[in-house]
């Protein structure tokens, strides 16, 4: 109807770093692939005296800012305006359904196999297998888990052990880095895990094993790499800020069709 409105999100990523005076500068940062749930209405790369290019690789998008010379404190901006994609079309999703096991031996192998037995017993399919694996690895009182984590209980280390256990069962897993769409609240990328079940990607909370990505999460990039890399500079930092506004749904639908 005429009165219906939809959310429009403005996202700013502010990139700050210190350039070294001698070397050319190359800054690479992941930006959202925007291939499923959201559509971009406007995207800008703001800088002074930098060349800009955007590339796609392995399902991700990456912006590269480059300059022959720069010195001192540098600030670059990435700005994105997006909205939910409303489409009845079912896009065909592809993903891996098999993988090779990661190499493991010694006490780690025994610990991993000891964890695998109950995981297999309590699982019926990919979804329950991944969920059960995540729950087991988050049980920090388990001696087998303690041995595999080796004193490092960070989210990335836990994800690494979850990945190892899933590989023994030939179940593929990817790390997913998301941003939460909440107005006027500073955000940092949040780690999720996903696995392909033959039809679709299933998303899992790496702390609880709960399945399903909340609707306010925007997928920013997947894989093991960091959000940003800087050649010819140091102390790189990315700050996210966002706000939302409403727009007439009919007008927004027209804009969405144009993009």
Predicted regions and their residues:
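Intrinsically disordered, low-complexity N-terminal segments that are enriched in acidic
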Residues: 1-87, 249-258
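A short, structured loop/turn motif at beta-sheet edges
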Residues: 20-23, 69-74, 119-124, 168-170, ...
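Stable alpha-helical elements in mature extracytoplasmic
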Residues: 27, 126-129, 133, 158, ...
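Short, solvent-exposed aromatic-acidic interface loops
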Residues: 33-34, 45-49, 156, 206-212
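Acidic low-complexity segments
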Residues: 72-153
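Hydrophobic/aromatic-rich core segments of domains that either
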Residues: 160-239
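Short hairpin/turn module used for nucleic-acid contact or packing/dimerization
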Residues: 227-259
């Amino acid at each position: 109807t005429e009165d219906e409105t939809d959310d429009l999100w403005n996202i700013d990523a502010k990139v700050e770093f210190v350039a070294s005076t001698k070397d050319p500068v190359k800054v690479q940062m992941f930006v959202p692939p925007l291939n499923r749930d959201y559509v971009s209405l406007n995207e800008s790369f703001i800088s002074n005296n930098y060349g800009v290019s955007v590339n796609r690789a392995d399902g991700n998008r990456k912006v590269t800012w480059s300059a022959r010379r720069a010195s001192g404190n540098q600030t670059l901006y990435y700005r994105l305006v997006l909205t939910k994609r409303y489409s009845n079309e079912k896009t065909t999703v592809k993903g891996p359904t098999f993988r090779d096991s990661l190499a493991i031996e010694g006490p780690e192998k025994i610990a991993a196999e000891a964890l695998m037995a109950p995981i297999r017993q309590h699982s019926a399919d990919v979804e329950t297998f991944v969920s059960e694996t995540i729950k087991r690895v988050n049980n920090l009182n388990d001696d087998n888990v303690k041995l595999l984590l080796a004193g490092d209980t960070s989210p990335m280390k836990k994800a690494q052990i979850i990945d190892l256990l899933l590989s023994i069962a030939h179940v593929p897993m990817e790390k997913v880095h998301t941003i939460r769409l909440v107005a006027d609240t500073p955000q940092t990328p949040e780690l999720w895990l996903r696995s392909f079940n033959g039809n679709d990607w299933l998303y899992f909370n790496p702390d609880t094993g709960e399945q399903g990505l909340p609707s306010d999460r925007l997928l920013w990039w997947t894989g093991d790499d960091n959000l940003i890399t800087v050649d010819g500079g140091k102390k790189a930092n990315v700050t996210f800020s966002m706000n939302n506004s409403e727009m007439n749904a009919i007008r927004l639908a027209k804009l969405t069709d144009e993009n």
